[in-house]
Regions:
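Cys-nucleophile CN-hydrolase/nitrilase-fold catalytic domain and related Cys-dependent amidase chemistry
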Residues: 21-126, 132-133, 197-221, 225-228
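Active-site catalytic loop in hydrolytic enzyme cores
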Residues: 83, 100-203, 207-217, 283-287
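Residue-level recognition of beta-strand->loop/alpha-helix junctions
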Residues: 11-13, 46, 126, 195, ...
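Short beta-strand segments enriched in small/hydrophobic residues
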Residues: 1-15
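A short C-terminal boundary segment appended to hydrolase-like catalytic domains
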Residues: 279-317
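Short, well-ordered beta-strand micro-motif
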Residues: 114, 160, 250, 270-272
């Protein structure tokens, strides 16, 4: 018997700095209600879905910085999301900036949660691959200070929910094949992935025309090579003067895009996702147990950066 989940990739248009949490939550609620009306069981929102992408600015005032974070989830302004999800019987994935106090120490993470159809949090993920830079770089029109405002997460976990095995990732994680493989080795059948990606890359502007191609390429490869669904959901449009690529989509285990957003605003892309389709890839071409050779992959965990080989020398054939 097929295991079907009707999934909505809930793209958001730009969120401006002047927008309140209440403004944004109302947009998320509209997505939940529309997705429910269209028969969905799961809605996937973007990374940092409650605020503008604040790492584009260098800020020194702690109070100004803290205003972008959630110190509890659900909190006073987000509880209605959980209540509505429970009332509608629909689950969701949500990305946000997390402010945690652990052993008396204040910590900040770029976080996502998975909420089931009862309104309960069943999984939490903290972004592992933080892009950008840690120090203010005045030459940039927009900063990319994720390394300044967040600590990295430590693991790629999976959770049982929605009738299958679910994984989570955030934005830059999608560019690293290890992201998908670690979850694939835990049997992931659907990976939920929110992102905020600018069109322009100041250190390498020659790549700008390829930004959408690269965005889809890495998610399609990750889906196919691990026999898993991937739901990639963006913040899109011109946000505080910065162009965001959008391109939200749902990708099958075949690597094919089966649903996609076509605008730069609030939009749903919906697909009927059969989790049993994963098996045809996990049991054949990508049967890990039969074909993988982990004994040959030691460098992946032993070495961080590339090291070139020694000068050319003759070898014994």
């Amino acid at each position: 018997m097929s295991r079907i989940i009707n999934v909505a990739a809930a793209q958001l248009g730009p969120i401006q700095r002047s927008d309140t949490r209440r403004d944004v939550v109302e947009r998320l609620l509209a997505h939940l209600r529309q997705a429910h009306a269209m028969g969905c069981q799961l809605v996937v929102f973007p990374e940092l879905a409650l605020t503008t992408f604040f790492p584009r600015w260098y800020m020194e005032d702690p109070a100004e910085i803290d205003a972008f974070y959630e110190s509890e989830m659900p909190g006073a302004q987000t509880r209605v999301l959980f209540e509505t999800a429970r009332k509608l019987g629909i689950g969701f994935y949500l990305g946000y900036a997390e402010l945690a106090v652990e052993q008396g120490v204040k910590r900040r993470f770029n976080t996502s949660i998975l909420v089931n159809q009862n309104g309960d949090i069943i999984g939490k993920y903290r972004k592992v691959h933080l892009p950008g830079h840690a120090e203010h770089e005045p030459w940039r029109a927009f900063q990319h200070l994720e390394k300044h405002y967040f600590e990295p997460g430590e693991s790629f976990d999976v959770w049982r929910g929605f009738g299958g095995v679910m994984g989570m990732a955030l934005c830059n994680d999608r560019r690293w094949s290890e992201t998908y493989r670690v979850m694939g080795l835990q049997g992931a059948e659907m990976i939920l992935l929110g992102y905020n990606t600018p069109v322009h890359n100041p250190p390498a502007p020659e790549h700008d025309d390829l930004s959408m191609f690269h965005n889809h390429l890495v998610m399609q490869a990750g889906a196919y090579q691990n026999g898993t669904w991937v739901v990639g959901v963006a913040k899109a449009g011109k946000e505080e003067g910065c162009e965001m690529i959008g391109g939200s989509c749902i990708i099958a285990p075949s690597g094919e895009i089966v649903a996609a957003c076509s605008t730069k605003g609030d939009e749903l892309a919906i697909a009927r996702c059969d989790l049993d389709l994963c098996l045809s890839y996990k049991s054949t071409t990508f049967n890990f147990d039969r074909h993988r050779r982990p004994e040959a992959y030691g460098l992946i965990t032993e070495r961080r950066g590339a090291v070139e080989p020694a000068p050319e020398a003759a070898v014994t054939a």
